[in-house]
């Protein structure tokens, strides 16, 4: 993190440090030689964009209801089971228009949580974009698409087809207080891991825009203490909850958000609780 006119800013370090980050933030304003720009030690570090780019560009979370009736892949040319860049696939469903670009998504696991009353809730279904395609033919409810790009995965039957939109990737994030977020919150998924997060990891939290969360919000992560036996009395004890790190939200959805682990003294477990974190001004 760097400071500009007394305000903390976060951006991608492209090898030129805070001077370059601020120059890009100000639209090319050249810093005067006497201006002193320095990183904030022991504060929020610059986030390398490559750590979160995949989730910014190719991941989304939608309600299962919103996916009802959307087109899906039913096959590929030459009876292929999988398809990649430059190949042709067929989709079934209404709404595909010839000449338009589409994103092809693999469905992940839904976010199922238990609320305070013990009832299970579905907070959304995670979708990962595996390819981009353009519709080249259409007849009734069957469309032919040509895959123009693929992203580290093949296209398979059953994958969803949704409109593709150009997204401007943010290069700066502003760390801000999370005081107005609906109380509670926890880590409900660790991306790319079976359940432990560390520094530079991406996690999903069960708070989204309906709870007041915005990109840039910083939370402290508090981990419940272990259950142990008293060595003298053999009583079952729970060690105190400890603050173990900080995360910053970088992409929000209705009921969940993606966050980047800024720092972590211990591995973060699923269920680790969130609390507002104070951002140094």
Located regions from the model:
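Surface-exposed, polar/charged interaction patches used for macromolecular assembly or partner binding
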Residues: 1-281
């Amino acid at each position: 993190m760097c400071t500009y006119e007394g305000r903390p800013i976060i951006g991608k370090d492209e090898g030129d440090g805070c001077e370059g980050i601020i120059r890009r933030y100000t639209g090319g304003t050249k810093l005067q030689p006497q201006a002193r720009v320095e990183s904030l030690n022991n504060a929020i570090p610059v986030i390398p964009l490559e750590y979160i780019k995949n989730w910014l560009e190719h991941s989304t979370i939608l309600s299962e209801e919103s996916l009802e009736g959307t087109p899906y892949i039913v096959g590929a040319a030459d009876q292929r089971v999988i398809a990649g860049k430059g190949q042709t696939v067929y989709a079934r469903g209404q709404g595909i228009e010839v000449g338009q670009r589409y994103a092809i998504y693999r469905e992940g696991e839904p976010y199922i949580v238990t609320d305070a009353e013990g009832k299970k809730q579905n907070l959304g279904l995670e979708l990962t974009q595996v390819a981009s395609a353009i519709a080249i033919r259409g007849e009734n409810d069957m469309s032919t698409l040509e895959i123009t790009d693929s992203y580290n995965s093949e296209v398979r039957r059953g994958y969803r087809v949704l409109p593709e939109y150009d997204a401007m990737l943010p290069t700066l994030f502003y760390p801000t207080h999370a005081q107005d977020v609906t109380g509670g919150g926890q880590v409900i998924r660790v991306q790319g891991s079976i359940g432990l997060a560390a520094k530079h990891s991406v996690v999903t939290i069960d708070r989204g825009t309906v709870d007041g969360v915005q990109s840039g919000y910083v939370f402290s992560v508090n981990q419940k203490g272990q259950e142990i036996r008293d060595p003298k009395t053999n009583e079952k004890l729970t060690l105190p909850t400890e603050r173990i790190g900080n995360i910053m939200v970088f992409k929000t959805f209705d009921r969940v958000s993606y966050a980047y682990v800024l720092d972590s003294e211990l591995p973060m477990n699923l269920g680790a609780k969130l609390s507002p974190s104070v951002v140094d001004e």
